Structure formats: structure tokens, C-alpha cells
């Protein structure tokens, strides 16, 4: 596989970020009966206020991460892989990038959350060493919160 190259998203990338996110999350609409939260996000604000990085493979945008820095952890607000690029290890590489950012920022923990109905996501995060911290009701389902220690406290 070619090397994945990362680039910070700018205001010119709002439509691209939204398109990758919509493509990645579209399969979940029939599962939960509505658009998942990332499909309704304000990506103008996200790009302005958070670290949003696009992942490129062979000059094509294939995924993204959106990170929010907190005092004691790095929150993965969104991760999305273009369905056309599935099966190439891009999701795993994006997660490595998230953890790398946390370590470089001196943050000891990466946190994330997902819908409990997204079974493949739950398994993916568990395989990467993320542990469930808690579950909370959200709309008609539950949100599952994960965390992983990645650096020194």
C-alpha cells in the first residue's frame, strides 16, 4: 500500500470533509433511522475550532479525523473513511495518527464515542485497545464512550 499523507483541512475543504463524512456514515442511517451526528455537523466551525486532518492515498482524499484538545485527553470527535477505500487499513492508520497527536501534545489518553448500534465500530475500537468507559442514553439509542491510555500522565 502507498503511504498515507495527512494535510490539515482549511476553509476550502468544508465540502470535501462533509462529502467524506456523509459517504462514511450513510450506511448507518437505516440502522438508527436518522442521520448520525457527524452528518449534521457544522464543518465550517469544526475546521475553524478543531484539528481536522484529511488523509490522502495516491493523491485522493480517503479519510479524515477531527480532534478536540481537552485538559487531560484528546477527543476523537470524528473519524471517517471513504467506503471506496475500505479494506486498505486506512481506519487503523487514522487511529495511529490520532494516538500520535495525543503523545506529541503530552496528553495521556485518547477518548472517543460512538453509537452502540454501530457494531463494527465497537469491535474496531476494542481491537485497537480502547476500553469502554460508560454508556449513556442518546435519542433512541445509546452512546458508548471509549478511552485508551497512550502516553505518560
Task: Describe the role of every protein-language-model region.
Residues 54, 60-68, 75-80:
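Conserved beta-strand in the GNAT
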Residues 9, 79-81, 114:
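Hydrophobic adenine-recognition pocket in adenosine-nucleotide-binding enzymes
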Residues 44, 52-53, 108-131, 135-153:
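C-terminal "cap" of GNAT-fold acetyltransferases
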Residues 64, 68-73, 87, 115, ...:
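A short, glycine- and basic residue-enriched loop/turn
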Residues 18-49:
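Conserved GNAT-fold acetyl-CoA-binding loop/helix
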Residues 81, 87-100, 126-127:
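Conserved acetyl-CoA-binding loop-helix of GNAT-fold acetyltransferases
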Amino acid at each position: 500500500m502507498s503511504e498515507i499523507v495527512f494535510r490539515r483541512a482549511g476553509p476550502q475543504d468544508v465540502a470535501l470533509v462533509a462529502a467524506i463524512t456523509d459517504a462514511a456514515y450513510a450506511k448507518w442511517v437505516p440502522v438508527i433511522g436518522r442521520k448520525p451526528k457527524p452528518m449534521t455537523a457544522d464543518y465550517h466551525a469544526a475546521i475553524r475550532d478543531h484539528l481536522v486532518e484529511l488523509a490522502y492515498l495516491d493523491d485522493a482524499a480517503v479519510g479524515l479525523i477531527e480532534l478536540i484538545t481537552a485538559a487531560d485527553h484528546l477527543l476523537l470527535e470524528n473519524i471517517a473513511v471513504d467506503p471506496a477505500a475500505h479494506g486498505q487499513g486506512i481506519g487503523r492508520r487514522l487511529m495511529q495518527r490520532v494516538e500520535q497527536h495525543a503523545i506529541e501534545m503530552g496528553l495521556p489518553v485518547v477518548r472517543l464515542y460512538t453509537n452502540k448500534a454501530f457494531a463494527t465500530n465497537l469491535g474496531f475500537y476494542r481491537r485497537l485497545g480502547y476500553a469502554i468507559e460508560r454508556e449513556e442514553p442518546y435519542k433512541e439509542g445509546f452512546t458508548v464512550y471509549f478511552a485508551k491510555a497512550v502516553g505518560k500522565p
